A protein has these predicted regions:
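N-terminal signal-anchor transmembrane segment
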Residues: 1-51, 71-79, 358-360
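Membrane-interfacial loop-to-transmembrane alpha-helix junctions, especially the N-terminal start
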Residues: 2-10, 54-68, 114-121, 196-198, ...
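Hydrophobic transmembrane alpha-helices and their immediate junctions
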Residues: 53, 60, 190-197, 222-233, ...
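Aromatic-anchored transmembrane helix interface
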Residues: 64-68, 83-107, 116, 120-125
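Alpha-helical transmembrane segments of multi-pass inner-membrane proteins
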Residues: 118-147, 168-213, 217-231, 341
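A membrane-periplasm/extracellular boundary helix in multi-pass inner-membrane enzymes
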Residues: 134-138, 228-271
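Transmembrane alpha-helices of multi-pass inner-membrane enzymes
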Residues: 183, 352-363, 368-404
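Long extracytoplasmic/lumenal interhelical loops at the membrane interface
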Residues: 264-323, 331
């Protein structure tokens, strides 16, 4: 039953992203998601896991993690009761973070059929993005299911660039998830029956990433591919050869071409005005340390004397801007704790590249909303922490037979 619940979570997350929101207005409803169908499936999974599953021995990480999660909920409840009066973020984030805790704390975390669960996820991720590409060429940008209504979104005809969101709130959210999906495919490349199917799957993700028009996403993708290459090297036997200079030159040429394409659209030195936006956001946070609450999405702060924006274009700054400094710091602490622990557990360059890519995206845009965190954490678990039970696996040059 646990595997079935996880499959339901995948189907809802990747095909039918139904959620309920305080608002129906475009651009605000995603910011104020109260609950999701995917998280209902996660609640069922956690109930069955706690009821039927076998707990691992106590781990220091899970105790520290649980302590920060309890602190996060205590501070969120206080701020909601006294200032913000909106509980959707606290509810959704708690479900997502508890899900990661249960994955960490119990044996057989993927349920009764672990291998089937992984293959099902890989298949769903690829198929979802095949549908995404078809959806784009039909002329649509985003697909949402909110408050029992279907939204088929198109960009304005005179929009300044092409971009694609698929079932996510913004192109940067989509890019973040695509980076995660590619990392999972690299991590479990041996689960594909044929090498051609793996290359085709990666091609689907790269085409989808191109359609998203997230140049930061392509930088993050380069990092995970670099990490994957470094993981394939047997460093004990490594010897420098002149042919490597040729490969380095080809990479430099490819990087130069990519840089020229990006510079034709973006001023990289200005970071798209991010420094001014972040400075303005910090000033707004200092002025309202208890958080904006329902004002977020409507209220503006000054990035420059002649330019105002409605969000910090940064996941961590927005957490403080929206939900107060104490709650935001707890949220940041949770993400950093997960990052450090998963990197220590993975001992792989793939994980390092993935996390650097994640942090690039998380710091450049508001690319992780509460109803997306569950899938984000699931991807991190699969890439960095999960180990096939009783199965030998080559992992960063070492053979492991540990369970998950």
């Amino acid at each position: 039953m646990r595997t079935v619940c996880l499959k339901l979570f995948m189907v809802f997350s990747l095909f039918f992203p139904a959620f309920w929101s305080t608002f129906n207005e475009d651009y605000k409803m995603e910011y104020y998601a109260v609950f999701t169908a995917a998280y209902a499936a996660l609640l069922l999974y956690m109930i069955f896991q706690v009821w039927k599953g076998k707990r691992k021995k106590e781990q220091r990480f899970t105790l520290v993690y649980l302590a920060i999660l309890i602190l996060y909920n205590g501070l969120s409840l206080y701020m909601n009761l006294n200032y913000l009066h909106w509980y959707g973020e606290q509810i959704n984030n708690t479900v997502a973070f508890l899900f990661f805790l249960v994955l960490m704390a119990y044996e057989d975390s993927l349920g009764e059929k672990e291998e089937e669960c992984i293959r099902f996820f890989l298949g769903c991720a690829v198929l979802s993005n095949v549908l995404s590409i078809v959806y784009y060429f039909l002329g649509y940008t985003a697909f949402l299911i909110c408050n029992n209504h279907f939204y088929f979104v198109r960009l304005p005809e005179d929009y300044y660039e092409f971009r694609h969101y698929w079932i996510y709130s913004h192109k940067s959210d989509y890019a973040l998830m695509l980076i995660g999906f590619m990392a999972v495919c690299i991590r479990f490349r041996d689960r594909f029956k044929h090498r051609a199917s793996w290359f085709l799957s990666m091609g689907v993700f790269l085409v989808a990433l191109f359609l998203s028009h997230s140049w930061t996403g392509f930088g993050a993708a380069a990092l995970i591919f670099a990490g994957a290459v470094l993981d394939r090297i047997d460093w004990k036997k490594f010897r420098f050869q002149k042919i490597y200079l040729l490969w380095a030159g080809l990479l430099a040429v490819a990087g130069g071409i990519a840089g020229k394409l990006i510079l034709a659209e973006r001023d990289l030195l200005s970071l798209g005005g991010r420094r001014e936006i972040w400075s303005g956001a910090l000033k707004a946070i200092r002025e309202t340390p208890t958080g904006w609450g329902y004002l977020f999405g409507e209220a503006l702060f000054d990035a420059t004397p002649t330019w105002s924006v409605n969000n910090a274009h940064n996941v961590f700054l927005n957490a403080m801007l929206r939900f107060s400094v104490p709650v935001g710091l707890c949220f940041i602490g949770m993400i950093l704790l997960i990052a450090v622990y998963s990197l220590v557990r993975s001992r792989s360059f793939l994980a390092v590249g993935m996390w650097i890519g994640f942090f690039l995206l998380l710091n450049m845009d508001y690319c992780l909303l509460n109803y997306e965190i569950g899938m984000f954490l699931f991807v991190i678990y699969l890439v960095c922490i999960y180990r096939p039970k009783g199965k030998e696996e080559v992992w960063n040059g070492m053979v492991e037979t540990k369970g998950n």
